[in-house]
Amino acid sequence: MNILTTLREQLLTNNVIMPQEFERLEVRGSHAYKVYSIPKRKAGRRTIAHPSSKLKICQRHLNAILNPLLKVHDSSYAYVKGRSIKDNALVHSHSAYVLKMDFQNFFNSITPTILRQCLIQNDILLSVNELEKLEQLIFWNPSKKRNGKLILSVGSPISPLISNAIMYPFDKIINDICTKHGINYTRYADDITFSTNIKNTLNKLPEIVEQLIIQTYAGRIIINKRKTVFSSKKHNRHVTGITLTNDSKISIGRSRKRYISSLVFKYINKNLDIDEINHMKGMLAFAYNIEPIYIHRLSHKYKVNIVEKILRGSN
C-alpha cells in the first residue's frame, strides 16, 4: 500500500480537501498549528499544539490508514479501543509491591528519526521524498524555521497511535523480562507501572529500563527520575490516578470521595453554576465506573435518588 496515494485518494475523492491544499500540507503541514497552554494537574503548564482544521482531517484519515499497519503491544493501555485507566490499574490490583516510572516530555520527544525506525520495523518502506511528506503531515515544527526540529504534538489526533507504535520494541522486551520474573508490566502513554508480590524483585528495574530506553531510542526518549516511585501495601498505592486498596480492589480514594460529596451537597443547595454542574457529573460518572459501590453509598447518604438523577442527566 502506498500510504500517501491512499490518503490523497480518500481526501480528494470525497472532496474533503482541495488538491492544492493537500500539496501545501505535504510541504508545510508542520507549520499549521495553533499553540496554547493549559495548566498541568499539579504544577506548571502544558503546551498544546492543535492542528488546523484541514491538517486535522488529514491526520484522522492517516490514522485510519496506519492503524492496521502499525503494531501496538498488549501491555499498552492508553488510546487502545476497549481499554481504560481502570483496566490498567486492575492489572496491578492484586500485587503488594508497585514501581511507577514516567517518560519526560514524552510526545515532544518523539521525532521523525524514531518514526522512520518504527516504519521499517513494521515493514513499511517509503522513499525519502515520501517520508518527508509524511513527516510534514504528522509532526509539528515549534520554531517554524525552514529546517526546524520536528516533534510529535500534544493535541494531534494521530499522536496517540504514533506514540504507541514507536514504543512497541521497548514494550515487548521489557514485558518479556517482567514475565520471566513474575512481574506485571503496563504502559499508559508516558506512565509505566510494574507490580509483583515478590519482595525486592522491582529494585533493579529502573536501571534496566533506563539502559533499554537508551539502547532503543538513542537518548531521544528519557526517564523523568523525579517521578520514579516505589510503594507497597504499607503506603498508599496509586496507578494512573486510581487507588489500589489492600483488599486487592480499586478505589477513587478518600480525597475524591470527600470532594464529590461536597459537590453533590452544593448542587442540592443550588450553589453550583452550569460549568460546576457539568464537572460534578463527570466526577460522578468517573466514580461510578471505578467504584460503583461508592455511588450507592452516596445515594443512601442523601436519601433521595438525587445522585441517580444526576447520572441520568435529569434536573
UniProtKB/Swiss-Prot annotation:
Catalyzed reaction equations: DNA(n) + a 2'-deoxyribonucleoside 5'-triphosphate = DNA(n+1) + diphosphate
- UniProt entry keywords in alphabetical sequence: Antiviral defense, Magnesium, Metal-binding, Nucleotidyltransferase, RNA-binding, RNA-directed DNA polymerase, Transferase
Q: Which Pfam families match?
A: RVT_1 (PF00078)
Q: Would you kindly state one Gene Ontology biological process term found in this protein's UniProt entry?
A: defense response to virus
Output the InterPro entries linked to this UniProt entry.
DNA/RNA_pol_sf, GrpII_Intron_Splice-Mob/Def, Reverse_transcriptase_msDNA, RT_dom
Give residue ranges for domain Reverse transcriptase.
Answer: 19-244
Q: What are its E.C. numbers?
A: 2.7.7.49
Quick one: which residues bind Mg(2+)? 102, 190-191
Query: Keyword Ribosomal protein: yes or no?
Result: no
User: SUPFAM superfamilies attached here?
Assistant: DNA/RNA polymerases
The source's domain of life comes to Bacteria
GO MF annotation list? metal ion binding; RNA binding; RNA-directed DNA polymerase activity
Q: Which family does it belong to?
A: Belongs to the bacterial reverse transcriptase family.
Function (record text)? Reverse transcriptase (RT) component of antiviral defense system retron Vc95, composed of a non-coding RNA (ncRNA), this reverse transcriptase (RT), a probable ATPase and a putative HNH endonuclease. Expression of retron Vc95 confers protection against bacteriophages T2, T4 and T6. At multiplicity of infection (MOI) of 0.02 cultures slow growth when infected with T4 but do not collapse, at MOI 2 cultures enter growth stasis. Responsible for synthesis of msDNA (a branched molecule with RNA linked by a 2',5'-phosphodiester bond to ssDNA).
Q: What is this protein called?
A: Retron Vc95 reverse transcriptase
Which lineage? Bacteria, Pseudomonadati, Pseudomonadota, Gammaproteobacteria, Vibrionales
